[in-house]
Amino acid sequence: EDTLLVINNHLESFKIGDSDVKAYQEIIDSPNDKKNAVGIRKLVKKLAEGTVIRAQQVDTIASIASRFKGKGVIVCGDFNDSPVSYAHRVFNETLQDAFVQSGNGFGFSYVQHQMYFRIDHILISEGMQSYECTVDDSMKGSDHYPIWCYVSWK
């Protein structure tokens, strides 16, 4: 009998608000302006806090998923983290990135405030294959575009 574990998640965000976006834009526009120091410290603090909480969440999810090694596992959702993050590195020990397997382009799922990130992911067991992994940028109901794909057993 086949087993499939699906873990759909929304990992901790950086809680970047409008004032943070404004500070970020000012830093980009005038990187050497000393008055940006407060904005930089505030952004770094938010990034650090979000990263610590998300790492704990990732460790918990990875522990649960590891109990199903050799079975079908799909971990998907809003990771609020890029493909070069701690989250991705931990999950990639046992799972494969469906977008890398069968997607095209950059796969940006978050496109706001002149920021472009691939932070929504579908990760699958090694015994599975993804097809036509797509970020659907025609869907405008959220600040994220949905990512979807077909998955089959190898």
Features from the language model and the residues they span:
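Metal-dependent phosphoester-hydrolase catalytic domains
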Residues: 55-74, 79-154
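Short glycine/proline- and acidic residue-enriched helix-loop micro-motifs
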Residues: 36-49
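Beta-strand-turn-beta hairpins that frame and shape the catalytic cleft
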Residues: 1-37, 128, 151-154
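Short, mixed-charge, low-aromatic patches
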Residues: 15-20, 47, 76-80
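Low-complexity, intrinsically disordered or weakly predicted helical/coil tracts enriched
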Residues: 27-39, 64, 98, 103
